[in-house]
């Protein structure tokens, strides 16, 4: 747990850490030795303010609304708003807050490292059903949310298929290993940005078959990258 985020193990998480230590000791393991033997490596991890995380996590657990200031990287705007926290998400080494935004009157996902101020309010948080949260925030690939879901059909070369066929990109994915060794993967997505960014690292070993809009976006991204080297 210390390796997840050492500065964030405040009063809310310390009891959990102590309980895990007790369980390991009962099994004959020393917690200190376990920490030395297990390493968690994070690439692209963004640091967050421990005080901000403490306020957000405590309000989430205690079911209070939060007044926060958040920087939207897509619009480059900083906006103050009140939210009803629902859950905290750790995704690829970074922390996010799923919440009901009282300003937009809709579900939103906030990167906690982009929150500059946070204050727990006395008002009780609005409760949103798990089904509604999953429908709004959890249908597509990656961290970006949306309800307008399409399906990406991707074909990986034989050399790349050895790895990709054993990976889970989405709970509803469909994968088929072809006789020639290539691997076709169908993945639901609601926002193409993260999917394209991930596909670019595979270079010539992956092809977007459809939809045409995603294929065109991928082509433009590859052409833009190529121009940097010509």
Residue ranges and their predicted role:
Residues 57-96, 100-101:
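Loop-centered beta-sheet repeat module
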Residues 80-82, 109-112, 151-153, 184-186:
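Well-ordered beta-strand positions in beta-sheet-rich domains
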Residues 103-136:
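Flexible linker/loop signature enriched in Pro/Ser/Thr and Pro/Gly
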Residues 138-230:
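Polybasic (Lys/Arg-rich)
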């Amino acid at each position: 747990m210390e390796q997840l985020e050492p500065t964030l193990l405040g009063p809310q998480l310390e009891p959990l850490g102590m309980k895990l230590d007790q369980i390991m000791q009962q099994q004959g393991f020393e917690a200190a030795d376990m920490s030395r033997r297990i390493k968690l490596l994070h690439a692209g991890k963004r640091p967050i303010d421990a005080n901000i995380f403490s306020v957000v996590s405590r309000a989430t657990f205690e079911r209070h609304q939060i007044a926060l200031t958040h920087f939207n990287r897509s619009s480059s705007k900083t906006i103050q708003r009140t939210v009803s926290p629902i859950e905290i998400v750790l995704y690829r080494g970074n922390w996010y807050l799923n919440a009901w935004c009282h300003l937009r009157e809709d579900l939103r996902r906030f990167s906690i490292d982009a929150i500059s101020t946070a204050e727990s309010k006395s008002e009780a948080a609005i409760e949103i059903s798990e089904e509604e949260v999953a429908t709004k925030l959890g249908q597509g690939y990656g961290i970006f949310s949306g309800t307008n879901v399409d399906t990406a059909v991707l074909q990986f070369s034989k050399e790349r298929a050895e790895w990709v066929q054993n990976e889970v990109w989405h709970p509803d994915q469909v994968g088929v290993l072809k006789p020639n060794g290539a691997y076709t993967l169908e993945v639901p997505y609601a926002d193409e940005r993260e999917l394209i960014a991930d596909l670019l690292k595979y270079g010539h070993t992956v092809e977007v078959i459809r939809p045409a809009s995603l294929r065109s976006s991928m082509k433009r991204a590859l052409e833009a990258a190529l121009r940097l080297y010509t």
